[in-house]
Amino acid sequence: MARPVQRFQLWSPLGFLLQLVTLLGKLGPQVQSVRPESLLFVSTLDGSLHALNKQTGDLKWTVKDDPIIQGPMYVTEMAFLSDPADGSLYVLGTQKQQGLMKLPFTIPELVHASPCRSSDGVFYTGRKQDAWFVVDPESGETQMTLTTEGLSTPQLFIGRTQYTVSMHDLRTPALRWNTTYRRYSAPLLNGSPGKYMSHLTSCGMGLLLTVDPGSGIVLWTQDLGVPVTGIYTWHQDGLHQLPHLTLARDTLHFLVLRWGHIRLPASSYQDTATQFSSLDTQLLMTLYVGKEEAGFYVSKALVHAGVALVPRGLTLAPMDGPTTDEVTLQVSGEREGSPSTAVRYPSGSVALPSQWLLIGYHEPPPVLHTTMLRVHPIPGKVSAETRASEDLHAPPVFFELLNLRREDPELHPEEKASDSYPGLGSQDLLAATFTAILLGAWVLYLMRQQQQSPSAPAGPPDLSQDAQGQLSRDILQDQRRFQSPSEPAQPPHDPEAGQPTVVGKISFNPKDVLGRGAGGTFVFRGQFEGRAVAVKRLLRECFGLVRREVQLLQESDRHPNVLRYFCTEHGPQFHYIALELCQASLQEYVESPDLDRWGLEPTTVLQQMMSGLAHLHSLHIVHRDLKPANILMAGPDSQGQGRVVISDFGLCKKLPVGRCSFSLHSGIPGTEGWMAPELLQLPPDSPTSAVDIFSAGCVFYYVLSGGSHPFGESLYRQANILSGDPCLAQLQEETHDKVVALDLVRAMLSLLPQDRPSAGWVLAHPLFWSRAKELQFFQDVSDWLEKEPDQGPLVSALEAGSYKVVREDWHKHISAPLQADLKRFRSYKGTSVRDLLRAMRNKKHHYRELPAEVRQTLGQLPAGFIQYFTQRFPRLLLHTHRAMRTCASESLFLPYYPPALEARRPDATKS
């Protein structure tokens, strides 16, 4: 008995502590398992439920389901739109009131009141269906779906309700309208959750920002790709909804980029429009109308003063739908209308997706008041009219979300524990407490042993000074490693002091900002190995975007008209790309008359831009975001000449070998107002590199017109693009340069992508010919035609439409000295294009033999000579170029036409 007792005394309490550590190690995987309280659940419009880490925003898993809103894909007859956040209903157009209007009930309320009917004889039916599903919090795997037929023991027990509303009209056999709305069973979380974290989303896209409400610093961002409809947390074994604020995409970028953080003011229950006066801007509550694969939807959103709004009651198109005279639904007791009134667009626009006119930010609409739901009042609910009128203002919970004063928030103990230490639950805390007690006992034991043995060393006998120092360093590293992610890493310098930031071979001053982009991207002026560069800083979460952009830059930057890439460096929070430093953008070139242009004429700018684009297309790279802001001006070089480069490869797409199109599964690329129509049309086709040609056509007109857009003002720009209705008034003047430019721009802006020219064809267009090349072309054509019979196909094509080309009789439009000189040698037909070219060729060949008076009239060779004729006959060059296209493969005409593989070109527009 003595030996076992002695063995027990040898390792007590050290042996017991080691046994406990071994036991906890075996339980390690259970301690480290993901707990629901550590996750933030985000629902998106496509029906997916995403689980994010509350502290870092990392995506853990995604459960896919049916879309939140499913309705008509096209707004052709019925114009009912739904808000996926709460199921609110809006109607576009009634008999006497045009524009967007809000109905005083939601889809769930309409289902509760069904069956019911409106005063114009339209019957409403509704159906509600509840379901449960169970999700594994570790993997996101959906184990089963529960109905009333059975129960199971859940891990994450989530309820979802589906509401279906149908509208029937006895006067027509077809179903008038139907929609399906789904929402999670998640009551609003009590307390003030917004004081610890504030969540901001952008409408029309899936960008989610989580902000520290005390400092306004962005803790993390996550792009889910689809608009966010709800944010939830797990609290007391159930899903609870968290408030979030939806802002316009540009407004969200405006707030972040203007102050470097979300600087929103504290406020109470006042009007939203007046809350932001202290910010030198103004945010207004609007209604955003968007479109996803499941159909149109609406969402309340805050916008700043720079965002274009659709006015209240704006008539988008004349209505030719049926009349409903016997309607009792009234607006403010004066105007009458019905939510069942059919909305139709003009017959000329039905084939085109004119419903895109809806998309944008609308002023808050008026409310249609109706007695339809009073037949079946909803118990325990505020009246629909009262709730609808209050809904025009920002909910009070938003103002708590915007409260950014630094206070010591009183959090719920569960919330504070789960948010600060997402991996710890009640069992984990118990184990940690027990371990701490044992460690304390071990320390007391050592102290007692030290008191009993005065000669013992002060510290543990097996740790040297170096070992103790290493242990201290390891502990310090562990503290840094396990620092709360909500506390941003401190930079090694004070940004306000203007000291440079050095990351590898790149250095830059954070205060020297050159530009800002989407997704928190900044561009700084910096240095790379002694060379002045532009440093593009991207968020750490954008690693895939950085890698793709760098790969495309490395592959394409050997061309002088593509932005040059130098290197990439990675920091703890950001990625840094060193790029060629440019002096201005094309937008500044056009809109700033005082800007030094370094000898770059507008046509030279466009030619260099197309040269860079043709290089990208030859590498099977589609840029997908051409616009003036992405075309930069570099230089000047040693001769004082500038250079045009294409930049911003963030949306570029590398086409696989053997493919000429790309899909839109990852979203619609580009910038509104500069995107090709096929990117937005439904059903979507597989776009090709022709999308770049369309965007380039918009840029062409923007440059040649001095800043105008071919599709009008920004509010109606994308709708005009979809209708294929450009306004090229700035190029309508009957001059040589504008006639040639109009021909090219019109071809590049063709509605059908197959009708647009290739990049190689654009570069071969006469718009970019020098005066010497124009003169040589006319001479070569005239020489070639001398061998052709008068009634041959080539001469016939040249003489077709000659009446407009020679302006009835070209003899009448040349000077008297030249007329007299021409009559000295032979006769020329004034109505013949062939004879006009012959006269030009003869006078060019015998220029030195001409009388001084005639030479003075014609001007110097080649520029003055050719301009003498093209100014008098603006259509001559284009007409001749089209007529001679059948000879494009002849060696004499190869310099004037693109290669056969590049000859994609629509039929010539008849002039």
From Swiss-Prot:
GO terms for molecular function: ATP binding; magnesium ion binding; protein serine kinase activity; protein serine/threonine kinase activity; RNA endonuclease activity. The chain crosses the membrane at residues 427-447. GO terms for biological process: apoptotic chromosome condensation; intrinsic apoptotic signaling pathway in response to endoplasmic reticulum stress; IRE1-mediated unfolded protein response; mRNA processing; negative regulation of DNA-templated transcription; positive regulation of JUN kinase activity; protein phosphorylation; regulation of DNA-templated transcription. The active site is at 625 (proton acceptor). InterPro entries: IRE1/2-like, KEN_dom, KEN_sf, Kinase-like_dom_sf, PQQ_b-propeller_rpt, Prot_kinase_dom, Quinoprotein_ADH-like_sf, Ser/Thr_kinase_AS. It is a single-pass type I membrane protein. Residues 771-899 form the KEN domain. PROSITE patterns: KEN (PS51392), PROTEIN_KINASE_DOM (PS50011), PROTEIN_KINASE_ST (PS00108). It is found in: Endoplasmic reticulum membrane. GO terms for cellular component: cytosol; endoplasmic reticulum quality control compartment; IRE1-TRAF2-ASK1 complex. Keywords: Apoptosis, ATP-binding, Endoplasmic reticulum, Glycoprotein, Hydrolase, Kinase, Magnesium, Membrane, Metal-binding, Multifunctional enzyme, Nucleotide-binding, Phosphoprotein, Serine/threonine-protein kinase, Signal, Transcription, Transcription regulation, Transferase, Transmembrane, Transmembrane helix, Unfolded protein response. It catalyses: L-seryl-[protein] + ATP = O-phospho-L-seryl-[protein] + ADP + H(+); L-threonyl-[protein] + ATP = O-phospho-L-threonyl-[protein] + ADP + H(+). SUPFAM superfamilies: Protein kinase-like (PK-like), Quinoprotein alcohol dehydrogenase-like. ATP binds at residues 514-522, 536. CDD domains: Luminal_IRE1, RNase_Ire1, STKc_IRE1. Residues 1-33 form the signal peptide. Residues 508-768 form the Protein kinase domain. Residues 448-911 are cytoplasmic. Glycans are attached at residue 178. Its main location: endoplasmic reticulum. Autophosphorylated. Residues 453-472, 479-504 are annotated as: Disordered. Residues 35-426 are lumenal. Belongs to the protein kinase superfamily. Ser/Thr protein kinase family. This is Serine/threonine-protein kinase/endoribonuclease IRE2. It comes from Mus musculus.
